[in-house]
Regions:
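Class I S-adenosyl-L-methionine
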Residues: 1-129, 134, 140
Length: 141
């Protein structure tokens, strides 16, 4: 699904049938266990919705999991291409050790936390999309 980010300017919306747990991760919100790499990356480019659940009985060959039908609606204020790669790298580095705070996970990024105005003692799932975008803009490789 992340590969569709490059097409976000060319579509009105996209629909997918995915495993229910994946849908919950895609649609995760700040401060929850589902606010992770996938939900943060997608939320920078799309509004996400779980439209409805699909039970195993809906399939000829019943899967052992529930499914959900999701909708992704592209955002107009998309992250520019020069920031996208840095943004993805910051997200990946932040979640390298989910139990550590972002200061420890982003140690190699050499960030000035006081200049950013972000609490460096937050865990990755406690950092907002806006703050991740701010970190990415200040990140120098």
């Amino acid at each position: 699904i992340l590969n569709f980010i490059s097409w976000s300017n060319e579509v009105e919306d996209m629909h997918f049938l995915v495993q229910k747990e994946v849908a919950e991760k895609i649609n995760g919100s700040l401060g929850t266990k589902n606010w992770g790499k996938l939900s943060i990356k997608l939320s920078a480019f799309f509004h996400t919705q779980i439209l409805f659940d699909v039970p195993p009985e809906s399939f000829d060959i019943k899967p052992k999991v529930d499914s959900s039908f999701i909708r992704l609606i592209p955002k107009t204020d998309v992250v520019d291409s020069s920031t996208k790669d840095k943004f993805f790298k910051i997200i990946d580095m932040s979640f390298a050790s989910r139990r550590k705070n972002i200061k420890n996970n982003l140690k190699k990024a050499n960030l000035n936390w006081s200049e950013l105005g972000i609490d460096q003692n937050l865990r990755p799932e406690e950092v907002s999309l806006e703050n991740y975008l701010k970190i990415a803009k200040h990140y120098r490789e």
